[in-house]
């Protein structure tokens, strides 16, 4: 999704070379820069698996690298330690799965942190807001975790409405009339809770990062457990 969206955005401005061994694209020729959009699946303990990102960087020439994959704070620190002389940058993506290409094409600026953010403004031909990488990583996780929390909250409101024989759709409508809340992620589906690729992975990775730093994200932990229960039922 992320790789395809960036390909569509940049193909008119640059010669794009795809590197994806799983799809048969096994060799990089002489790129001027590399954008990393590989998956970072959860490990068994919920932490972010960095192997795919490491594999790409290890096979990439010494050129500027922009990581668009979702990575953890500790994952970034591992990369910096492993590749101290490489031109590493990170830029979070906030694309929706159903409209990733359109979302990226409508972007009017990019957030970048790392060794040379201004370079990537020239690549994308967009203004760059420069930030510290850890801030960007946590912001990415915070957005998805908050939306997962919102899904769980409205699912619990649905349960309460059901128990009281109250029409949930009316309650949700009157609640989300408040512009501060909005109606996104308030619709209840037959599957219940949140699934997909990003929300479960990212909320668990954020909880794991917090645990490693002796911080208890109790609200998010309960969200994960509640979601697990209703997804099984």
Regions found by a protein language model. Name each.
Residues 29-31, 62, 106-107:
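Alpha-helix C-terminal capping/helix-to-coil transition sites in glycosyltransferase folds
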Residues 1-30:
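NAD(P)+-binding Rossmann beta1-loop-alpha1 motif at the extreme N-terminus of oxidoreductases
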Residues 12-13, 77-91, 95-183, 209-216, ...:
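Internal alpha-helical scaffold of NAD(P)-dependent oxidoreductase catalytic cores
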Residues 27-28, 102-105, 186-191:
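Solvent-exposed alpha-helices and their adjacent loops that cap or buttress functional pockets
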Residues 40-99:
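Rossmann-like NAD(P)(H) cofactor-binding subdomain of soluble oxidoreductases
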């Amino acid at each position: 999704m992320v790789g395809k969206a960036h390909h569509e955005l940049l193909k008119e401005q640059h010669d794009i070379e795809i590197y994806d061994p799983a799809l048969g694209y096994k060799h990089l020729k002489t790129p001027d820069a590399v954008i990393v959009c590989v998956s970072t699946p959860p490990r068994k303990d919920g932490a972010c698996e960095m192997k795919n990102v490491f594999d790409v960087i290890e096979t990439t020439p010494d050129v500027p690298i922009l990581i668009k994959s979702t990575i953890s704070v500790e994952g970034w620190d591992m990369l910096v330690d492993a590749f101290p002389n490489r031109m590493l940058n990170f830029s979070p993506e906030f694309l929706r799965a159903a409209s990733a290409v359109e979302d990226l094409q409508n972007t009017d600026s990019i957030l970048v942190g790392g060794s040379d953010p201004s370079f990537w403004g020239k690549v994308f031909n967009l203004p760059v807001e420069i930030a510290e990488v850890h801030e960007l990583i946590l912001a990415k996780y915070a957005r998805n975790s908050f939306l997962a929390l919102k899904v769980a909250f409205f699912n619990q409101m649905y349960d309460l409405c059901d128990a009281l024989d109250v029409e949930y759709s009316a309650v949700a409508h009157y609640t989300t009339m408040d512009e501060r809340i909005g109606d996104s992620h308030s619709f209840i589906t037959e599957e219940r809770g949140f699934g997909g690729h990003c929300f479960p992975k990212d909320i668990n990775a954020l909880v794991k990062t917090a645990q490693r730093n002796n911080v208890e994200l109790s609200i998010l932990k309960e969200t994960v457990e509640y979601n697990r229960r209703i997804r099984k039922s």
